[in-house]
Amino acid sequence: MAFLYLVSPSERLTPIYHRYSRIENTEEVSIFQASGRILAEDIYSTENIPPLPRSTVDGYAVKSEDTMGASPETPAMLLKKGEIHIGEIPKEDIAPGQTMYIPTGGILPEGADAVEMIEYTEEISPYVEMYRSVAPGENTVQPGEDIKEGMLLIPKGTKLHARHIGLLAYAGITTVKVYRKPKIAIFSTGDEIVPPDSYPEPGKMRDANGPMLKAMFGGIGEILDVSPVIIPDKREAMEKALKEALNIADIVMLSGGSSAGTRDLVVSVIKSLPDSEILFHGLRISPGKPTIVAVSGGKPILGLPGHPASCFVSAKLIGTNIVEYIAGSNRQTPFVFIRGIIKTEVYSKPGIEEYLRVKIDFSTSPPTVEPMITQSGITYTLAMADGLARIPPEKEGLSAGEEVEVMLL
């Protein structure tokens, strides 16, 4: 066992990924059910988009050579043959010396190779005067200029979002092959933990971590209905729960029992599981230091801290990367960072990478970052935070006015 020194969580996790079995089973789903799923194949375009040349402006479809030398003093005068309606394929061609009105997005008629903007024209029935010349292709979008037939649209391993769904629909692709969602078993541990709908007796506390983790990973994974959800600090109960979970789950997570006192029990139970190994125990981060990452039969086991804030940070930095990897994602770091200016001075322990809960004022440029100074176990500030400011391990804090990297929540 060794401490994992995190500068980039995804970068530091890369060496252990090969110990885990990725999801290989796939299924076909409608694009209307594909948001948040991991694409299991490369998606290529089967057609040119647009399929025909279109106008990018309101104006007149012309043969560009008919406008050569046109100016306000010596306009080109073309015979108006008719109008093109949006969404219709023109039924007539234009010959030299002719033009047709065309709206933005209209399909160019045969014989036209450019569009004169309406601002540079004047209709004098039955003619239209053109006050400037246009080059071939001007104010048009050509077939395949947006998407070419055979073009790679979305690569395998992409986590599909709204923008991808829109592209698929635009390209006429209505079903996609995605990886099966990884099955995730989530447990909370500890004699002091009671269900959220209970009134805790003195010395007890409601389970915050279980619901939080289910919300965090319920989009990308299938959360299993395990029993018991809360495991007491008893070896037999923990061993039974983990063995049963590993029979049905792709990933097992448990929070609590990973810090001093009960952590030895968790480590001991994991070691007793078939084909298991503790890959690392403890991270040089705060909050989130007492984290266990293990493997059993190619399946990840994550032992997360008991404090909700510590559990959240560890699950975000470590759990997210592992779950996305197992699910088939090709993303290396599924986080969004910004840079801002810290408002007040803060201190941190050297050698520890600290993630500080902060409020962000986006009305300033660059954004102003205000620390929410509190203990790692305080839950309220986590819910109110806009982001986590990263203090590098080589620093002993940040001075007011110093630039800081912030992971958005």
Predicted regions and their residues:
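Solvent-exposed alpha-helices and their adjacent loops that cap or buttress functional pockets
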Residues: 53-55, 70-73, 91-95, 108-110, ...
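Short, low-complexity N-terminal leaders and the immediately following helix N-cap/first helix
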Residues: 1-74, 329-357
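Short, hydrophobic/aliphatic alpha-helical segments
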Residues: 34-48, 88-101, 293-294, 298-300
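Electropositive phosphate-/nucleotide-binding environments in soluble metabolic enzymes
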Residues: 3-10, 14, 25-28, 32, ...
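Short, glycine/charged-enriched hinge/interface segments at domain edges or termini
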Residues: 2-4, 60-229, 373
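Flexible glycine/proline-rich
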Residues: 27-32, 41, 87, 147, ...
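Helix-rich terminal scaffold detector
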Residues: 2-10, 174-304, 308-314
